[in-house]
Amino acid sequence: PNGRLIAYVSTGVLWVIPVTPGGDPLGPPRRLTNELADDPTWAGDSESIVYLTTDRLRRVWLTDGRIEDIPVALWWQRSTPTGRVVVHAGALFDGVSESLHRNIDIVIDGNRIVRVDPHDEALHVGEIVDATDGVVSPGLIEMHTHGDLASGEQLGRTWLSYGITSIRIPAGDPYDVVEARESIGSGRRIGPRIFGTGGTIDGSRIYYSGASSLASSAQVGLEMERAAALRYDLVKTYVRLPDAVQRRVITEAHALGMPVTSHELYPAVANGADGVEHVSGTSRRGYSTKVTALNRSYQDVVQLLAQSGMTITPTVGISGGYALVTVDDPSLFDDPRVTTFSPSAPQAVRLRGDLETSRRLVQDMASTLRRVVEAGGVVVMGTDSPINPQGLSLITEMEALVRYGGMSTIDAMRATTSISAAAMGYGREFGSVRPGMLADLVVFGANPLENIRAARDVRTVVKNGRVFQLDQLLQGPSR
C-alpha cells in the first residue's frame, strides 16, 4: 500500500521486492516464508502480509519476519440420515453381475444397505421406494469433471438428476473442492460424493492457470504437504512437468497413499503412475503417445494399459463423441434436465468436419477402449465436463463407447459403477449393491444392459440413504 514493496509468490513461497514508484526493482528480493503461500494480502499499514498456507491463515510481519496464526472458527459435522428405506426393485443390476436379479428388496438403515433379498412384503417397513417397473443400479460415477463448484446449489442437483452419486475432480481449486465436499457432507447442500485434488502439478511454465508451478523438484515436498493437509484423493501431474520430476511426485504421493494420474502414458507407466486421462489430450512431448492424428491407437498402447493395470479415463466426448451422439439423436435436448440445467447445450454442438469424417474419427477412438477392456485393462468413465454439459456428457460418453466403439453394455455399466469405485480405492464402500455398502442407487425406467440409452431414463436417485425423485431435483429448493 505504501508503494515501496511488491509481494508475490514464486517457487510456492512468499517474497517481497523493493521497487520504485514506477515498479522497477530497487534491490534483491527477500524470502518471507519456507511454507506454501497463497492469496497474499497486504495489511493497510504495509507492516504485514496475510496469506493462506495449506489449511491455515497466517500473518508475516515484515519488521522481524515473525509469523503468527490467525484463528478461524471453521468447523462442520457430517450429516448421516436415520431411519429405514426399502427399495423394491423389479430388477437389479448389482454393479458386477452380467444378468439382472429379479424382484428384489434393498433394505437401507441410515446410509448403509443392510439387506439385498428376494422380495418379502414383511420387509416393507419405513419409507418405501416402488421401483417394481424399473431397474435399480448402483449410483453412477463421473471420473473426470472440473469447475463450477462455487456456482451454487444447482450443480449438485444436476449431477443427481442424471443418477450420478459420486464425482472425481482431477484438477480444481483445492479450497473449492474442500468447501463443496464439506457442504454436501454436512447436508447444507445436496449433491454427489466429491473426490478431488488441487491444481495440477506442472512445470516452471504452467499450461493452465491455477496449476502449481514447480521450478525444481525441491518444491515437490511442499506440494505434498498441501495434499496431505487438505486430504487429496489423488494427485494430477501436468504436461509441462519434466518426466524426472513426475517420477518424484509419484514416489512421494504413493508414500501418502495417494494415486497419481496425468495425460502421459509413457514413461509414466514405467514410473508407477496409476492412471491416464484422455485417449487424446495434450502432452508434454508436443504429440500424443496414445493416439495418432487420425484417432487410431497402436497395439502397444493397449498392451501398456492392460498389462500395467493403469486406469484410463476416455473422455471420447470432447473428441467428437458427444457431438456425434447428439447429432444422431437430437431428442436428447428435449430432456427436461437439459432445458432446466443446460438450456444452451443445443447451440454448442460442433462436429469435427463432415458427418462421416466425424463418425469415423469417433469410431476409431472409441474402439480403443473396447480393445483395452478385451485385453484386461481398466477403463473408467469420465468426460472432462463442463466442456460438455455436466451429467448429460456422462450419459453420452457411455453411449458413444457402446454405439461407436463396440463396447458391451455390461462393460460400460461396470466402468461407470463398480470399476470406477474400485479405481478410487472405494470398491468396498460403493459402486455395487450388496449388504454393507453405502446406499447410493439410481432407478432407471428401462434396462441399460439391453440398451445403454436406458441410462437416460432416471426416475429416482438414492444418495447416502436419502431419496430424491427427479421432479424434486428439477424444481430445486423451496423458497
Residue ranges of predicted features:
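Divalent-metal coordination cores built from histidine and acidic residues
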Residues: 131-143, 147, 151-262, 266-281, ...
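Multi-bladed beta-propeller domains
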Residues: 1, 10, 16-39, 62-79, ...
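Acidic, glycine-enriched loop/beta-strand segments at the rims
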Residues: 93-105, 118, 389-392, 407-413, ...
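Hydrophobic beta-strand positions that form the internal "hydrophobic ladder"
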Residues: 3-6, 49
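Residue-level detector of Asp-centered blade-edge/turn motifs that repeat once per structural unit
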Residues: 1-2, 44-45
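Histidine-rich, glycine-flanked metal-binding segment
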Residues: 98-137
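Active-site neighborhoods of metal-dependent hydrolases
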Residues: 223-241, 282, 287-405, 478-479
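Divalent metal-coordination and catalytic microenvironments
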Residues: 57, 90, 106, 111, ...
